[in-house]
Amino acid sequence: PVSGRDLMLAVDLSDSMRTGDFVIEDEQVNRLQATKVVASQFIERRHGDRLGLILFGTQAYLQAPLTFDGETVNRLLQESAIGLAGERTAIGDAIGLAIKRLDLESDNSKVLVLMTDGANTAGEVTPLKAAQIAADRGLRIYTIGIGADEQIETTWFGLRRSNPSAQLDEESLRQIAALSGGRYFRARDSEALARIYEILDELEPVQRDLENLRPVVALFVWPLAGALLLAGLLLLPWRRS
């Protein structure tokens, strides 16, 4: 048998993810760019796992249902953009959507890795209520709070120090993880983020039969991408003939 699990990634696309407080290869990047680089490496290492992708902002969308096709999941992550799901942060709804999708499976180990840089400011369900339901359904949640604690900016009055992560609700993220039997991680820079994903690699796997692990190319429809394309076309100005 081959080890594996059902693992859903939930990535915050709210407006604050454009904050440029990370550095990768001596280049300053925003939080989503750093997430894409590190999570891409994580996805490539998940041989034998079924992976899924949820993108959330004001609303939560299932961008990739569970699949062995990690290449497609990675591509969809790389194509994501800040603001596509709205400017606010629906953490509870993202957890609820993961519960709904992962609950379709009964015997597999279920894991959600949720990354955010803020607090729950939108959605229909509170994060703690969603976390309790997740625990009841056997879904383990690992939460990652992303963002530096200090940023130095140049202003007309000289250098100014600020905390770009002032809105991060670490206490809620800790409670979400604790309720579901997971763990909370704090990623203040790209190195810490990479170490977190290495720790996640050590999650205990479930056993699967080899016959269930044949490579599959995902052919599912991408509803969020289609909806965004349609919205873009509708916003194009009409020209008079």
Question: Language-model segments: which ranges?
Answer:
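Short beta-strand-loop
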Residues: 19-21, 47-80, 99-105, 153-170, ...
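Extracytoplasmic/secreted envelope proteins and their assembly/folding machinery
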Residues: 32, 36-40, 70, 74-78, ...
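C-terminal signal-anchor/stop-transfer transmembrane helix together with its immediate cytosolic
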Residues: 1-2, 205-241
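Extended, hydrophilic extramembrane loops/domains of integral membrane proteins
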Residues: 171-203
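…and closely analogous acidic/polar surface helices at protein-protein or active-site interfaces
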Residues: 1-5, 17-50, 67-74
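Short acidic, Gly/Ser-rich segments with clustered Asp/Glu that frequently serve as metal-coordination loops
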Residues: 13-22, 119-122
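Extracytoplasmic
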Residues: 2-8, 37, 46-51, 61, ...
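VWA/integrin I-like adhesion module and closely mimicked acidic/polar interface patches used
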Residues: 86-89, 100, 109-111, 118-179, ...
